[in-house]
């Protein structure tokens, strides 16, 4: 990450706080047109769109472009990126071989991947400058009355691989941020009592993790297994209910930040106690809010431009007279909240597995999956594999799925939990939403 770009962008963000909402929209429009002029000559995908729709890069608006979907990104990756020497196949090989979140592809590009609501793996690239611009909002998030010292950050999540959360947090271990923070990552796939022991020894000032994981830590704090005194807790990766927010704040006796972030756009929104609700970070992002989805345009990523990219998050605007920030205020993000799976481990204790972590499995030909819970000691993993693969590739993918699940269960002391892997041609869809859940709970037998 380019430290100079990070500081320069943060300074620009601070100046933007003094602008009006109209000024920011105009500023973003100029950034957008600059981006379009850049990608017209470097991205075959966008060049075709610009030509087909007769778009003038110097007068265009975002809605001159069609909506982009994750499927578009997956199928047209090689033509979307502006460095035409990069291929999806090369990125896939890199992800398969590299597990350090701070490893750079060709020593130039940050690579992030995730599955998200579609269950399909998407790759997202950032140059060092792109990533620094996207990370600038992370500077100054914590501005509570903390004692002046090197702050200890504990991150609880998936830590082995190129996932957005651990990559964003791990940058605090490098360069300028490491002078301010001492960061330790805690693998969420470990048994909860191991996590608690290590966190007790670390004594974090700041705890960062999924909303569900943070809530479970709060429960362990009440039980006495965990004994920490953070000054700040930061929830990310999942919607945070008002009830859970109050429970976490009361348990840890500290204020809680709710950060809206994604693999595609990094920091997208922030909710602090003094804000009431959440502000979208519109310095370098353009949001289009709809009743059942949101489209976002990234103004800082020149390597993998995303214009009007559709996300399934629902953002509801909140009217406000006296704005603290010159951005759109929305209610807390309403998006996917998956069911956290609880199983009984080999010692007879209940422990959790977050489906969001299984959602980050990297299996080359695994297109989608769904977990059918049977009871607290068994489940079925339904795998939808890519079409057209050979019998050998199919068997290899199924073998890798079994290996990944075995490793996860072993790490959680759940070798006693049994599972079956079924190759499926289709997966169940929630009729009320039209989306397919990662975890299906029908016919459960006393699963928590």
Feature map (PLM): residue ranges:
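Adenylate-forming
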Residues: 187-194, 204-245, 258-264
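Short, structured coil segments at secondary-structure junctions
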Residues: 179, 229, 251-255
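AMP-binding/adenylate-forming
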Residues: 129-132, 152-213
